[in-house]
């Protein structure tokens, strides 16, 4: 009798474990934040758009400091991008890129509170990003082109971004984590007929000779 009942008891035991795990209060689950090795200080961007290919051509100046320990490398999130150049003080740096994260070798070790600014020239390709979003935001491409070639006359042509929670790195290299804070400024170049909107204050608008306009937004 005991031998025959044993499998049933084991099955009930596992069902009980599964049920308990499924009904656990979500607020009681510990969700560890990402380790903070380098801290973002400031982000400066210059961006323009390829409407046909749904891509962004960008330059980024990213200022960081070691959070606590001395560092000789830095890892930046950058999803599905083409990386053209990475430099510091006009000297090109060695790096490894796996299509998700750029690991950059710094020219020396930096101690806590010693700031350094990386320059990165890149192309963002949001249509090649494969990560998924959430129930509320089903996609996580970070950068969205709406009717980019103006074919659908019932829709306006728009480009907009959505960075929560880790989708900003689909359109510019960064440490894409909610526990990072950065001041920012951005130069956005668009055809003259478009309006731009960004965080911060619109400091200037410059008309270019090719029929585009560069808007400078400052949030520092």
Outline where the language-model segments fall.
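Acidic/His-enriched low-complexity segments
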Residues: 21-220
